[in-house]
C-alpha cells in the first residue's frame, strides 16, 4: 500500500477566505492588499505541505520512513508490543527441553527491544519503498540486519571505551549502509588483529539461519501488532504462486492521516505585503489569519512552557517586538539583478557562492589497482571533496530558495517580516528569507522608507562601506580614507558591476555592492539623495561586553571597546598576538618529539605512538600563520560557555580541516594534536585577557549547579530539597526559565539504523527530573544571551521614543537603520547599555531571585558575588568603537 498516495491533501481555504482578518486588512490597506496577504499566508501552508510530502517521499524511497515524524508515534506504540512478544517467545523456549528453534540462539545475542526496533524499521522500509515484497525477501533482509547488529554491536558493547574514543565519530560521518558496514568491517578486522573482541572473528550465519531469524520475527510482528499481512498471489499457478507481505490497510491509514496532519502544520512562512499583526498576547501575532499553527510570541519546547508567559506583564517587550516587525523593507533590485546574472556562472567572482557543479575528483593514479598506498591516498583526497560537496548542495538549495523569494517580492513597494523571540528573549525574524541572513540575503534587502541622506548620513554611509570591505579594525578617519581612496573603483562597480567585479573581492561582497550603488546615488544627486540602505553598528564580542559592563571590568571592557580609545581594540587580535608570542618561544625552547608507548587497557598490548613536541607544533602553526581568524570563534564563544575542549573542536573544524581540504594545511601532520595544542594556547590567552568574565561564568555555573542539586538528609536519606530550575528576569521585564529536563525515554542505539527513544513502561515511568549537567553548562550562555536580547529590545524602544527612529535592522548584537538616522542610533545603543547596567545589578538581581530556594546546607557552598571593578559606565558613551 502506498502511503503517499493515501495522504489526503489539506484544504487551507479557511486561511484565504478568513472574513475577520480580511475585513480588518481591507479597512486599513484596501481589499487588493488584504486579498494578497491572505493568499500569501495560504500559500505558505501549501508550500510547507509540499516540502513535507517531498521529504516523506524521499525518505520512503530511501527506506528511511521510520525516521519521519509521521512514523515515530507508530513505532513508539508498536515497539513495546513486539518487544513483549519476543521476550515471551524467548522465555517459552528457555524453559523447554529438547532442540531449540534455529532462531533462538541468534535472537539471544540482542536485547529484545533492539530486535523489535530493527524488525519494525526494516519492514517499514521495505514496504513503504516497494508497496509489497515477498516474505522470503523481507525475511532475508531482516535476518541480515539482525546479524549485522549482533556482529558489529559487540564492538560497541564489549569494547565500549574503544568504540567511544576511536569508532563512533568516524562511523557517524559515513552515510549509507554500504559505507558504514565497510568501515565497521575494517574496524573489526583491526581490533581482532590486536587481540580485542576476544581475538575471535565473527562466524557468519548461514542462509538458513538468517531466514529462520527473519521469518520468526515477521511472525511475531504479525501476532503482536498486525502491522503487516500476508497476501497470496497467483494461487495454484506453479510458476508464480507466492506469498507477499504488505502493510495492513489500517496502518496505511494511520500513517497517511498523521503525515497529512503534520504536512498541514508545517508552513514555510513568507514575508508580508502589509504590516504584520501586532503582538498583544502570547499567540496570534505576526500573521493575520490564525492558520493551523498560529505563531507564538516565544519559541518554547512545549505548550506548558509557553503558557508561563500568558499572564506576564511585559509591555516594553511587546513594544520592542512590534517595532521590529513594523519596519518596512523592500528588495534591492540593483543587487538582485547582479545576483541573478552571476549566480550560475561557472567561475563566479564571489567566492562564497556555491557552484552548480561538484568539484572534480582528483585523477586516479595509474597503479591504483595494485598500489594500496596510492589507493588510500586517493580515497583520502576524494573523501574531502565528497564532504565539501555535501555542504555545497545544501548551501546551493538555500541560495536558490532565497533568490526565488527575492524575485517573487521584487515588485513590491514594501514588505514586512513578522518577529518573535526564543525563550531567552533573543529576537528573530520568522520567515526563512529575512534580513538576519547571510551576506547575499542582507544585500538583497534594503529598508523601504528612506530620508535625504544629509552630511552626517553620508559620513556613516562611508563608515558602513569600509566595514563591508573588512576595513573595520581601524579608526573612523582611516575608514573614510579607504573609501575616498577607492572612489573610482566604487563608482565603476556601481556603473557596471558585471564587468567591474572589485566589489566581489570585499569581505561582505553583496552588502558592499549595495553600498556602491548608494554611494553613486549620493555622488550623482547630492546630499538630498533619499537613501534607505540599512547601516549596522555591531557589538565587539558582545558576550564579553555584557559581562564587562555588569562587572565594571576595566581590563575586559578595554579589550572589547567599552572604553574610549584612539585605536580599535580587537580582542581576537589581542588573543592571537599573545598566542603568537608563546608560539615563537615554543618554536625555539619547546619540547621535542617523542615516541611514547601506549598500553591498551583491555588487552595489555603495548604499541608506540609519535607525540609531537611543542617545538614542532609551534613551528607548524607559525608556518600556517595565526591571525584573529584562528582565535575568533573560540574567543567569541567563551562567553557562551565554550571551554578548552570545545576550542579544540572549533580549531579542528574551522581552521585545520578546511586548510587540509584546500591544500594549505599540509604542515598539520597530526591534526588532533595541532588542534589540542592551539586550543590550550587560546584558552590560556583569553583567560588572562577577560578574567572577570570567566569569574562571572563560574559563579553562574555554581548557582545553577546548587539549584539543580538534590539535597538529602545524610542519615535518613530523606529528600530535603528537590532539584530546581533556574529563573531570572531581564532588565526590560522578560522572564527567562532555564529548565533542562532528562528525557523520559530510554535511548536505543543501533550500529547502522540510528537511534530511537523508547517510551517508558508503566513500571519505569517517573518524573524525568532536572538535568543537572545541562543546567550548569547552559547557564552562562543563556544568561548573557538574555542580557543582549534585553539590550536590543530596550534600544529599539528607546531609539523610537527618544529619537523617532522607525526603521530597524536587528541581528542580536547588530543594530541598523537608515543613514539619516544612523548617528541617533549610534548614541541610542550606547545610552541604553549605560542605562541597563547603571540601573540594574543583574547578577545581584539573579541571586536575589534564587537565594531563598537554596537549602540552608547549601549556603556555604555558594560563592560570593563576583567583585566589581572600576570601569566607569559613562565612558561607554564616549567610545567610538563599542558598537561600530
UniProtKB/Swiss-Prot annotation:
It holds the Pfam family RNA_pol. The active site is at residues 538, 632, 813. One of its GO terms (biological process) is DNA-templated viral transcription. One of its GO terms (molecular function) is DNA-directed RNA polymerase activity. SMART domains: RPOL_N. The keyword Nucleotide-binding does not apply. Coiled coil: none annotated. Keywords: DNA-directed RNA polymerase, Nucleotidyltransferase, Transcription, Transferase, Viral transcription. One of its GO terms (cellular component) is DNA-directed RNA polymerase complex. Its EC number is 2.7.7.6. InterPro entries: DNA-dir_RNA_pol_helix_hairp_sf (IPR024075), DNA-dir_Rpol_C_phage-type (IPR046950), DNA-dir_Rpol_phage-type (IPR002092), DNA/RNA_pol_sf (IPR043502), RNA_POL_N_sf (IPR037159), RPOL_N (IPR029262). It catalyses: RNA(n) + a ribonucleoside 5'-triphosphate = RNA(n+1) + diphosphate. Belongs to the phage and mitochondrial RNA polymerase family. DNA-dependent RNA polymerase catalyzes the transcription of DNA into RNA using the four ribonucleoside triphosphates as substrates. This is DNA-directed RNA polymerase. It comes from Enterobacteria phage T3.
Amino acid at each position: 500500500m502506498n502511503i503517499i498516495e493515501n495522504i489526503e491533501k489539506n484544504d487551507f481555504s479557511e486561511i484565504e477566505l478568513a472574513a475577520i482578518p480580511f475585513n480588518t486588512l481591507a479597512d486599513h490597506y484596501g481589499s487588493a492588499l488584504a486579498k494578497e496577504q491572505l493568499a500569501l499566508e495560504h500559500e505558505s501552508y501549501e508550500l510547507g505541505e509540499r516540502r513535507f510530502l517531498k521529504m516523506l517521499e524521499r525518505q520512503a524511497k530511501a527506506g528511511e520512513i521510520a525516521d519521519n515524524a509521521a512514523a515515530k508515534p507508530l513505532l513508539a506504540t508498536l515497539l513495546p508490543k513486539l518487544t513483549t512478544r519476543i521476550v515471551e517467545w524467548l522465555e517459552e523456549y528457555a524453559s523447554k527441553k529438547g532442540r531449540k528453534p534455529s532462531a533462538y540462539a541468534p535472537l539471544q545475542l540482542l536485547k529484545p527491544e533492539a530486535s523489535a526496533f530493527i524488525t519494525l524499521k526494516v519492514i517499514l522500509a521495505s514496504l513503504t519503498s516497494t508497496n509489497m515484497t515477498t516474505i522470503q525477501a523481507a525475511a532475508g533482509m531482516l535476518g541480515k540486519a539482525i546479524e549485522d547488529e549482533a556482529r558489529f554491536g559487540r564492538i560497541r558493547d564489549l569494547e565500549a571505551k574503544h568504540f567511544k574514543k576511536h569508532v563512533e565519530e568516524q562511523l557517524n560521518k559515513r552515510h549509507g549502509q554500504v559505507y558504514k558496514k565497510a568501515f565497521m568491517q575494517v574496524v573489526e578486522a583491526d581490533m581482532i588483529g590486536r587481540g580485542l573482541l576476544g581475538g575471535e572473528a565473527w562466524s557468519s550465519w548461514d542462509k538458513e539461519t538468517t531466514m529462520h531469524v527473519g521469518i520468526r520475527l515477521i511472525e511475531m510482528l504479525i501476532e503482536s501488532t498486525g502491522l503487516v499481512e500476508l497476501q497470496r498471489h497467483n494461487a495454484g499457478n506453479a510458476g508464480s504462486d507466492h506469498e507477499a507481505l504488505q502493510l495492513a490497510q489500517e496502518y496505511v491509514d494511520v500513517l497517511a492521516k498523521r503525515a497529512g496532519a503534520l504536512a498541514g502544520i508545517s508552513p514555510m512562512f513568507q514575508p508580508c505585503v502589509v504590516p504584520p499583526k501586532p503582538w498583544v498576547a502570547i499567540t496570534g501575532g505576526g500573521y493575520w489569519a490564525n492558520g493551523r499553527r498560529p505563531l507564538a510570541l516565544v519559541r518554547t519546547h512545549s505548550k506548558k512552557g509557553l503558557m508561563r508567559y500568558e499572564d506576564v506583564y511585559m509591555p516594553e517587550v511587546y513594544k520592542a517586538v512590534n517595532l521590529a516587525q513594523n519596519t518596512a523593507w523592500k528588495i534591492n533590485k540593483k543587487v538582485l539583478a547582479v545576483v541573478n546574472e552571476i549566480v550560475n556562472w561557472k567561475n563566479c567572482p564571489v567566492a562564497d557562492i556555491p557552484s552548480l557543479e561538484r568539484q572534480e575528483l582528483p585523477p586516479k593514479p595509474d597503479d591504483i589497482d595494485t598500489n594500496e598506498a596510492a589507493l588510500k591516498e586517493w580515497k583520502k583526497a576524494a573523501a574531502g571533496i565528497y564532504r565539501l560537496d555535501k555542504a555545497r548542495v545544501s548551501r546551493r538549495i538555500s541560495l536558490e530558495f532565497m533568490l526565488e523569494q527575492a524575485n517573487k517580492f521584487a515588485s513590491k513597494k514594501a514588505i514586512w517580516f513578522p518577529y518573535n523571540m526564543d525563550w531567552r528573549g533573543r529576537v528573530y525574524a520568522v520567515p526563512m528569507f529575512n534580513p538576519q541572513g547571510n551576506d547575499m540575503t542582507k544585500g538583497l534587502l534594503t529598508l523601504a522608507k528612506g530620508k535625504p541622506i544629509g552630511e552626517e548620513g553620508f559620513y556613516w554611509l562611508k563608515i558602513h562601506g569600509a566595514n563591508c570591505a573588512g576595513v573595520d579594525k581601524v579608526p573612523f578617519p582611516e575608514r573614510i580614507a579607504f573609501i575616498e581612496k577607492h572612489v573610482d573603483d566604487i563608482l565603476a562597480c556601481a556603473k557596471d558591476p558585471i564587468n567591474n567585479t572589485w566589489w566581489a573581492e570585499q569581505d561582505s561582497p553583496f552588502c558592499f555592492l549595495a553600498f556602491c550603488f548608494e554611494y553613486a546615488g549620493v555622488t550623482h544627486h547630492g546630499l538630498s539623495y533619499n537613501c534607505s540602505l540599512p547601516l549596522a553598528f555591531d557589538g565587539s564580542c558582545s558576550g564579553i561586553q555584557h559581562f564587562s559592563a555588569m562587572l565594571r571590568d576595566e581590563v575586559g571592557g578595554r579589550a572589547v571597546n567599552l572604553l574610549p580609545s584612539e585605536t580599535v581594540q580587537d580582542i581576537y587580535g589581542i588573543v592571537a598576538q599573545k598566542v603568537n608570542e608563546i608560539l615563537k618561544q615554543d618554536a625555539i625552547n619547546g619540547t621535542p618529539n617523542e615516541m611514547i608507548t601506549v598500553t591498551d587497557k583491555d588487552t595489555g598490548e603495548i604499541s608506540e605512538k609519535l607525540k609531537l613536541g611543542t617545538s614542532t607544533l609551534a613551528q607548524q602553526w607559525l608556518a600556517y600563520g595565526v591571525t584573529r581568524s584562528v582565535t575568533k570563534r573560540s574567543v567569541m564563544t567563551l562567553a557562551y560557555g565554550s571551554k578548552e575542549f570545545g576550542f579544540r573542536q572549533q580549531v579542528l573544524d574551522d581552521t585545520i580541516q578546511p586548510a587540509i581540504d584546500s591544500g594549505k594545511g599540509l604542515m598539520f601532520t597530526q591534526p588532533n594534536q595541532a588542534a589540542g595544542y592551539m586550543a590550550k594556547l587560546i584558552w590560556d590567552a583569553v583567560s588572562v585577557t577577560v578574567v572577570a568574565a570567566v569569574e562571572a561564568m563560574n559563579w553562574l555555573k555554581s548557582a545553577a549547579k546548587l539549584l539543580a542539586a538534590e539535597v538529602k538528609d545524610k542519615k535518613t536519606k530523606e529528600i530535603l530539597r528537590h532539584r530546581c530550575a533556574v529563573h531570572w528576569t531581564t532588565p526590560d521585564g522578560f522572564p527567562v526559565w532555564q529548565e533542562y529536563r532528562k528525557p523520559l525515554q530510554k535511548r536505543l542505539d543501533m550500529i547502522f539504523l540510528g537511534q530511537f527513544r523508547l517510551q517508558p513502561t508503566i513500571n519505569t515511568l517517573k518524573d524525568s527530573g532536572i538535568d543537572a549537567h545541562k543546567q550548569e553548562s547552559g547557564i552562562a550562555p543563556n544568561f548573557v544571551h538574555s542580557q543582549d536580547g534585553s539590550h536590543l529590545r530596550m534600544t529599539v524602544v528607546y531609539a523610537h521614543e527618544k529619537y523617532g527612529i522607525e526603521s530597524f535592522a536587528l541581528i542580536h548584537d547588530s543594530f541598523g537603520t537608515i543613514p539619516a538616522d544612523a548617528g541617533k542610533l549610534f548614541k541610542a545603543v550606547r545610552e541604553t547599555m549605560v542605562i541597563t547596567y547603571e540601573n540594574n545589578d543583574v547578577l545581584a538581581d539573579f541571586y536575589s531571585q534564587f537565594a531563598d530556594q537554596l537549602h540552608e546546607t547549601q549556603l556555604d557552598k555558594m560563592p560570593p558575588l563576583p567583585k566589581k571593578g572600576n570601569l566607569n559606565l559613562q565612558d561607554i558613551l564616549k567610545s567610538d568603537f563599542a558598537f561600530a
